[in-house]
Amino acid sequence: MSGPRLLHGTVCVPSIDQALTLYRDVFEQTVVHTGTVGKVEAEAWEAPALTGAKSVVMQPPSGSPVYLRLIEQPDPAGYQPGTHYGWAALELSVKDADAMYTRLLAAGTPIIAAPKALSFTDMLYPMQARGPGGEAIYLNEIRGDLPSSDLPMAKCWVDRLFIAVMGCRDMKASLEFYHALLGTTTGGEWEMPYSVINISFGLDASTAHKLATISDRRTVLFEVDQYPVKSTPRPQAKGGLPQGVAMIGVKVDSLPEGANWVVPPIHRKEAPYLGAMVGVLRGPDGELTELVC
């Protein structure tokens, strides 16, 4: 490996069993580990209340080494999905967005936006849904690469997580933080109407928002969205994690020196780390990011 790559997206949900009906049954992800959150793991996240919480780790049937992890915790008071800073969405590569839309409707999954062709390219055909923890899930039928980036076409019904999306108070500050941390660059910047944000905040459909991508050469890692001024920090229970997309894991060639770790990096045996060194930090809006080496 050369350069940072996504390793996992972790989602906190009120019911593991309910979440599995979407991620395992509808998305057809393979469960590779079922267990509970360990004490060391919970302490690394500053979430001691999650010690013993149910946890499931899944992998796409393609075998791509990018994982989804579910952790069970109750929804906190004041949680309004889509309106808080921090990790907001997971973008997954899918074989057939229209078929996925039909299947999600039949399953009763909340739809944010139906599949829609994009004005600037015919290589992407995305839709968006809302998951059981309030997480936004972008399901993108990739038909080819873009001029500035290589994208993973799905090799199975739902393939790997390929972009993690964050909502932030200050897009520039978030870009600078992650570029300094990961050695990345800004892949592109745009200002456009964004249905996911406008629906969440009750804004007019034509309201434009700034967004940018964080890339390692031709690989996009993150999308960074400038959230409206009325956005709020994500509420979370004492000793718990943020609900919805709680953290993102990034595999790196080496751990950065002098990083402001939540706890010093340690070897972690549990999935999805399997013996790797893992360090945990907080970004500009308090979002948790794990660096894995």
Task: Name what the model sees in each region.
Residues 6-7, 86-89, 161-162, 241-245:
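Eukaryotic phosphotyrosine signaling hubs
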Residues 17-35, 80-87, 99-109, 173-176, ...:
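Extended intrinsically disordered, low-complexity coil regions enriched in Ser, Thr, Gly, Ala
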